[in-house]
Amino acid sequence: MIFLGILWSFNSAVSQKPPYPNAQFITTAAWLHSHLNDSSIVVMDVRSGDHFDGSLIPGAVHVPWSDFRYNDLDDNLASTFVGIRNAQKILGNAGITRSDTIIIYDSVGRDGGATASYVFWVLDVLGHQNKKILARGIDAWKENGYDRVTAARKPEPLLYQAGLDQIKRNSLIDGNFVYRQLGDPFYQIVDVRSQEEYLGKVGTKGLEGVPLKLGHIPTAVNINYTEAWTDPESKGIKPYAGLQKRYRGIDPSKGIIVYCNSGRRSSFSYYILRLMGFENVFTYEASWKEWGNPDRFFPVETTPNKLINNTLPGVSTKVSAQQSSAGKDSSQNRSSQPDSGYISCGG
């Protein structure tokens, strides 16, 4: 009965009506099983460390998601994106080309897809058109009783090269960009961490073990990335109607900046928003490991912000943030924030 419930959870999330606006970004184990021998399909196992159990979907290449990150010692940033050139090299070494349809999977144990989503984000930045995440990853494959193998496919390296006009360089935003948008009515900021992290009740440390600042980016609202799950056990993605309800108040006509601590969790929220049809979505990949670094003079607050009148608070002079007494602003007050003004994505 438990198995049937889990099976229904992820199958219904993919085949439900109305479908996700960008339903091409998600697939089921059953669909993959029936298309496994398609010449255009490349299956990509992105699990790493203890989350990789040594068994793979037949024909899969193994490219740990962590290969796309490195520790930037110059900027004192842990686990940051390796960059466009290196990302293309990693994909090429795995025998992947621009014309391939890439099926990305990890495992339920890895936050229900929050590493597959990081690779999805990388592919989105590179402008790779044909990509899908396997709903519930290797777990869904196992639950269907499909065959597995113990050796990854090791193809000959190929040239993976995106055209300059295809790469979304403007998607690679940093703290300075986010800071300049704090008063811009076009941008909405969403903190996808836990409520405890958002309110500054729980802190983390930077690359050198120095405690990061507590709180969140001013004007940001908190929508935990886990709220896209149907439940914490199966970690299946909610049907479209459920996602619409949770993200009510987020304006799809505006830019949305999502962040977490290191860019991994926010990549999942990025994926969910893309699945829902949002186009102007940006992952602040350096996230709190940059913004919360005490060496950087970015303002923080611990007072929660709420969505009001279906509009994100704090993004215009007409709509201000509704703040409760549950928290307080940091010592860096609002006067340190920039004046309102539109800055293009190229800033």
Each predicted region: which residue ranges?
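Bacterial N-terminal signal peptides
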Residues: M1-S9
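Sec/Tat signal peptide C-region and signal peptidase I cleavage site
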Residues: N11-S15
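Rhodanese-like catalytic fold shared by cysteine-dependent sulfurtransferases
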Residues: Q16-V42, G49-Q188, V192, E196-G347
